[in-house]
Amino acid sequence: MSDNWTSEELEAAVEAYLEMRRKFLDGEDFRRVDYYRALADRFPRSTKSFEYRMQNISYVFALMGRRWIKGLAPLTHVGSKVASQIEAIINKREGRPPSQIAEFSSSVSNYQKKKKRLPPEGNRTPPKTKTGGSQFVRDPGVVAWVLDLANGFCECCNKEAPFQISMEHPTWK
């Protein structure tokens, strides 16, 4: 068994998560372990592996600003590449447009975890991306650096800054 998850394994895990989430939001009863067992029967991974992966999926939902399944608290140990894959699968399954919220947030978090780092170079002419309007593409290294310098406080008014999210790490909002 490879440590790396195949796209088929990730898609099956996200599909199971979305079904559980629908039941959770509708107030229907379900047993998470039944889903883990069904997945473990299909793929060469343990039920515990699928439980952890479901918590990674909760983390991606939280990064996207969406509600996750109670009892599957977000587990932040997921790389930005896998977070991006999970986000893409969620968006595809739900018919949503592609986004890179989870990948960017995960990259910021990874930069913040580095013990010693120099100020990032940044980009004096950042590229723009088209959405409903235009916005600059942010450098996750710069965002992480600024968040660390701010230390939870607004640089303009010195009040506690409003960029905290519920998973104990800041976001760039």
Residue spans of the language-model regions?
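Defense-system signaling and execution modules centered on TIR/cGAS-STING-like, death/scaffold domains
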Residues: M1, S80-G122
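Eukaryotic helical DNA- and histone-tail-recognition domains of regulatory proteins
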Residues: N4-F30
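Short helix/loop segment immediately N-terminal to the Walker
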Residues: F24-R31, Q164-P170
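Short alpha-helical "recognition helix" segments of helix-turn-helix
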Residues: Y35-A40
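Short Lys/Arg-enriched helix C-cap and helix-to-coil transition segments
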Residues: A62-K81
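Short, charged surface segments at domain edges that flank catalytic/cofactor-binding sites
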Residues: V108-T171
